[in-house]
Amino acid sequence: MTTPSPTKKAALAEPKLFSGIFSLGTDAVEASAIIHIDSSGELVFKFSSIPYKAQSDFISAAWHDPSSDVVHFSFKAVAEDGARFETDHLFFSGLGMTSPEDAGTLLTPEARCAKGTLRYALKEPFPLPALRMRLKGFRNFGSLHAECALGRLEMNGPHEIDDEDDAADGWLVVQAAEPPPDDALWHDESEKLLEHVRRIMSFATASLLRVPIIEYIAGSESEVTVWFQTRQRSGVMPVFHFLAHDAIFAAAVGSYFSPPIVVKHLFFAIEWFAMEGTYNEIRLVNAMTALENLIDSNVEPSEALILPRAQFEKIRRVLLSVIRTCLGKWTAALANDASLELKEKLADLNRRSLLRKLELLAARWKVPLDGIDPASLKAAKQARDKVVHRGQYYEDARETDADLWTHVTIIREVAVRFLFTAIGYEGRYISHVGGYHDAVFPPAVKSAGETH
């Protein structure tokens, strides 16, 4: 792999003066700014003062507009060495106005950027294109490597315990092994591959690995696209230790090209699973939502319903007739209200419960649920329902009820096994059921008479 590794903790792009046009719609004015990318992957601007004249009045007008809408400016500029910057997503965080002697009024924008692009000329041609994501929050010991139809992949991150989560010092890169026949097609497919791997590794680390920068290096130019990102946080319950990412990385790459199961909305489930949770109530809801998303997105109609719709429709009509007969003894007003509500509820009678759909999907996908007590799974689902529908779990909990943390570990374990099956992973991982420990997927089937 010939792409250079990012410099850790330092600015990811050194300060450079760019001069060009600052605009909003048809209004425009000349402007200059020193721009760099800090260690977290954010574009940082230091604008030179702009004379306040009729031509630049649109800047002050936009800042003082009483509307709560964020105004996005454009800035297209060039540095002395030929580097180019452009954005249509610049917004103000402040606007300074000063009036020094003999200089008139000056405007000094303080700006941030939702998305911007830097383009640099390379000192030497780059014959084999490469696409690189800069990652926040990814820790690893050494480099992860894989080869595939699109080229060579490499993923890396720091391994120091005190490493800052928000630093964009991890990276994921793919480089073509030979010149692709269609550069644009290679770029698009490679971006999809990297995004797939990033999501799977987010699942592995139980943290949404953010990507503030994507760099495309090809021919004589490096194109660096930068996005504004929220602050990165480490996962509380990682599925893998950062020293043991090799097998899940291999599964992430392999499942892009040859998925063992065609899974709908896999990425939504992973985002819910890896979403930051500060309380056990939130962790339980997130894990259950990830599982529910997988189930409801992937069950067949025959698994979601108890009876075929046409067959149940006959039963529904009979039930409606019985309900009308019973309600005939009520006053007209009460009977009408009750009839409308009961009619809506009748459709629910034919829908299978979440846990039953879980059983059916697990059977079809062959997800091993060995060691998962059905009673514990039911209790965890009920705990989630309490949190969602009334906002708390413990108020009337009995001494015999499981602690909320136990429910979290059960639901997360089931979600982990579904996701492992979806990507074809086999190997060691971290399980929290019964306490933090190493486990193996798929779990070994115990022989008759074996107790542990």
Indicate where each model-derived feature is located.
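Amphipathic, oligomerization/interface secondary-structure segments
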Residues: 233-452
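Long, contiguous, compositionally biased segments that the model treats as domain-scale units
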Residues: 1-200
